[in-house]
């Protein structure tokens, strides 16, 4: 019996062109000079969480700026420059600072070149923020009358309300602050030349005859910095402050009431946890969308 002729149905296959995204390279510039700190841990955790929640191939390297004079090259897409101990004034002229400012000038040069379509995005934290302000002549870096340590309200200016990095924040929002130095007297003409603006200031205290510190600046379209610590992790920092050793240090330096108020603020979901979950993730969002087009 002959086998019947079978005609296979014609199937039209549509092949989807899959766009393979390259890894986003992040450089963390460590300015802690080997001192024990929570900042680096917090930055790593934010990058881990951000990469996982957004299904991104996020790779990073760390550079010991002050001890080893290490700085990244221009193969990185995003730079996060940490806080650190000591005076942002006394390091002037040091070898590590020369290397750091050379890196910063390379970033600015790259971003100013129209041929470079993918720009480099930078976030400066605390000590790095003060160094950038001094180097770029954005404002006056001075020693405070007393140490700022604790959880404080940060007040947005009009420019800050339109800042993509602050999207979703209240006004004021709360941040961890730990510093002996501050940036005051912004040079507005210099900021305008760079395309920058002051975004936030510290709490208004009309009864105190001191200048209010600048708490955040957008330096250029691709560089932003904060005086406070947006990377501060409420849960991790709360546990850290409740260890016997750290509790003793804080109480001896700042008093029991300050320690107790920090624990209370850290456990408030509308304060540090809210800031932690918005500022650096917003910065990474904005940067990676621009990088990947």
Stretch-by-stretch model annotation:
Residues 137-235:
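Pocket-forming structural segment of enzyme catalytic cores
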Residues 27-31, 125, 178:
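Short hydrophobic segments within beta-strands
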Residues 1-2, 7-9:
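Short polybasic linear motifs
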Residues 86-160:
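Cysteine-nucleophile active-site neighborhood
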Residues 21, 71-75, 116-117, 168-170, ...:
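Flexible, charged surface loops at secondary-structure boundaries
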Residues 8-110, 234, 238, 244, ...:
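N-terminal beta1-alpha1 cap of cysteine-dependent amidohydrolase-like domains
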Residues 23-25, 121, 174:
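Residues that mark the start of a beta-strand
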Residues 55-58, 118, 171, 194:
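A short helix-to-beta-strand connector/capping loop
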């Amino acid at each position: 019996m002959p086998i019947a002729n079978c005609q296979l149905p014609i199937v039209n296959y549509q092949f989807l062109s899959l766009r393979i995204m390259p890894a986003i390279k992040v450089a963390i510039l460590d300015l802690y000079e080997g001192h024990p700190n929570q900042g680096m841990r917090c930055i790593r955790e934010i990058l881990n969480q951000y990469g996982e929640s957004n299904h991104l191939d996020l790779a990073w390297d760390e550079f010991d700026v002050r001890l080893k004079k290490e700085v990244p090259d221009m193969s990185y897409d995003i730079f996060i420059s940490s806080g650190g101990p000591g005076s942002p004034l006394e390091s002037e002229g040091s070898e590590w600072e020369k290397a750091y400012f050379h890196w910063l000038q390379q970033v600015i040069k790259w971003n100013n070149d129209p041929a470079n379509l993918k720009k480099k995005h930078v976030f400066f934290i605390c000590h790095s923020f003060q160094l950038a302000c001094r180097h770029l002549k954005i404002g006056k870096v001075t020693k405070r009358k007393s140490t700022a340590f604790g959880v404080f309200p940060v007040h947005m200016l009009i420019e800050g309300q339109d800042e993509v990095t602050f999207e979703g924040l209240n006004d004021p929002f709360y941040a961890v602050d730990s510093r002996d130095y501050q940036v005051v007297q912004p040079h507005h003409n210099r900021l305008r030349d760079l395309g920058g603006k002051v975004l936030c200031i510290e709490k208004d205290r009309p009864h105190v005859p001191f200048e209010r510190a600048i708490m955040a600046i957008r330096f250029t379209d691709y560089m932003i910095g904060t005086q406070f610590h947006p990377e501060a992790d409420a849960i991790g920092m709360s546990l850290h402050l409740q260890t016997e050793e750290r509790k003793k240090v804080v109480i001896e330096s700042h008093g029991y009431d300050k320690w107790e108020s920090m624990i209370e603020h850290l456990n408030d979901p509308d304060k540090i946890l809210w800031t932690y979950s918005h500022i650096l993730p917003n910065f990474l969002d904005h940067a990676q969308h621009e990088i990947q087009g």
